[in-house]
Amino acid sequence: MSKYIAITFSPVQSFIEKSRKLRDLYGASQILSDLTSTIVTHRPEQYHLISPGLLNSQQGMPNRVLLKIDSEMQSSSSEEIIAELQRAFLNRWKNILATCRKWVENALAPYYRSSEWNWQKSWKKWEKRTWEFFWGMGDNLESAMVDLENRKLARNWQGVNWVGESSSLSGTDAIAWYGMDRENQDMKTLDWSEENRHIALFYRRLAFLLDGVNDPDGQPKDRQPEGKYIDGNERLNIPELTKRLITLPHIARSLGVELPEELRQRGFRDLIRRPQDNPASVGQKTGWFMGDGDKVGDYLKDLGSDQKIRDFSKIMRQWGQKFQRDFNQTELGRIIYAGGDDFLGIVYNSQFPGPQLNSIDLDRVLHWLQTPHK
């Protein structure tokens, strides 16, 4: 007898809401799409993939997967196949983390002895505690999706504890730096000013290297990094640092991660958002828009046949690609993610900075978004 399986996953830490740069947003989207791609391309001979469609493109891969396992395909039990897919998912995330960590260690090797790197333990914790993986199973698609939703109610997650200062972006989780796992430290006697000095130097060096400056310590003290990837005054936790680094072409290539076409052609034009708590700071006002399919789950159930669902998934992904490409050509902003039944975009002034160019042309944005796009 055939079994239907529904799979999804979600970040425990929000990958989107605290982002100040386009690089954060693109990095988060790339990671989500890549992890879904890992699930649906692992041992495909064990199941029939129903959704998502359009596997030749990694961009905009939704994090909801529908599978069908026929009885003649079941050399392993359905539960064993699910466990194997989950292991592949987690191993891919471990590989992403390890690649980013090793790149930083190699880049900063001239400045720190190997014995000074005390941060591997924290990276190991984030291997297991970043994502929640959910699945449901049933004799038909509807029962599998209901089972998935029921299982999502029983969450089993543990946070990562930390001491010291936290991320300057989210305000949560430890700052990633080479000494974050130092042992035998007394919190009462620790010289916090000295630690902050080490952290500041670590991020200054890393920011300059990511900007392409080969001699960070040779730069004048009053010179600040350009901040293509990291601003010199930013302090990131491990997931946030990973989001930035996965957009580095060398790391993306080594992982086989597909960067969006417009970024390969035009590069990043990073957008600095003005923090809400400091309206006088550098940056510009931005607007956000998002869309979510109205009762798409119910629509999928009504479609009935597996082939109709496959066709619908493919059409939705094709629509998302065209929607993203068309909006990005308007120079009103960027579509960060468009796949499946949802999308996220940002609007801003593409001419910023400039005299009297701080406003967003909301009339044009609304007119474009309200125009039907097929």
Residue ranges, per PLM feature:
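Regulatory and interdomain segments flanking nucleotide-handling catalytic cores
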Residues: 1-374
